[in-house]
Amino acid sequence: MAVLPDKEKLLRNFLRCANWEEKYLYIIELGQRLPELRDEGRSPQNSIQGCQSQVWIVMRQNAQGIIELQGDSDAAIVKGLIAVVFILYDQMMPQDIVNFDVRPWFEKMALTQHLTPSRSQGLEAMIRAIRAKAAALS
């Protein structure tokens, strides 16, 4: 994974933002830190349905059984949301991802209240897809 903060630092940084404009800029910055997804990652099987923007998420399991995620979007804010989700699932095994509830983190960040309905639905679609892929590996 790129140089992204851990869960706790993400939350601290997010809460330090003075207003939602700063928070959106921070989310976009996180998306810019994601490594570039190569063309082969932008395949139909990695495409996430239910997002208005184009979203691709690639999931691999490393030799230690830990899930490694890569992703991209054609929308800057959505790419940032991908980074937020990846931070929350960082260093997890498939069963950990299946069992982990991201909603309390989103509530602490007041994230879903400030997203448009279509972005909230897209975020949910990303989480469902990651959890489904993780369930298939566990």
UniProtKB/Swiss-Prot annotation:
An example Gene Ontology biological process: iron-sulfur cluster assembly
Subcellular localization: Cytoplasm
Active site: C51
HAMAP family: SufE (MF_01832)
PANTHER family: CYSTEINE DESULFURATION PROTEIN SUFE, SULFUR ACCEPTOR PROTEIN CSDE
A UniProt-annotated Pfam family: SufE
Keywords, sorted A to Z: Cytoplasm
Keyword Repeat: no
Designated name of the protein: Cysteine desulfuration protein SufE
Family: Belongs to the SufE family.
Quaternary structure note: Homodimer. Interacts with SufS.
Gene Ontology cellular component terms for the protein in this record: cytoplasm
Annotated metabolic or biological route of this protein: Cofactor biosynthesis; iron-sulfur cluster biosynthesis
Domain of life where this protein originates: Bacteria
Function in brief: Participates in cysteine desulfuration mediated by SufS. Cysteine desulfuration mobilizes sulfur from L-cysteine to yield L-alanine and constitutes an essential step in sulfur metabolism for biosynthesis of a variety of sulfur-containing biomolecules. Functions as a sulfur acceptor for SufS, by mediating the direct transfer of the sulfur atom from the S-sulfanylcysteine of SufS, an intermediate product of cysteine desulfuration process.
